[in-house]
Amino acid sequence: MTGNGSGSKTVVLKIPRSFLRYYRLSSDVVQVQGPEDATILDLIRMAELPEVEFGIAAINGEREYLSYTPKDGQVIELHPILMGG
């Protein structure tokens, strides 16, 4: 997974499997290519995922803001916003 050399990058977005019953996706892993300066939120939008569903991102077990700019080849775990009642 490497960018194409023209200022782009490719990352993998990993979404919770439970979302597959609500959204028509072929897999819980989505590979997306975007510009080098794309944030996690930008990449979620480029992958046409429902951005309002995800509020937490993790890379290598470390939490990152959706405004974080991931590096080429990184795997980003997306998690829903936790709500209590």
Where on the chain are the PLM-derived regions?
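Ubiquitin-like/PB1-type beta-grasp interaction modules and other compact soluble beta-rich domains
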Residues: 1-84
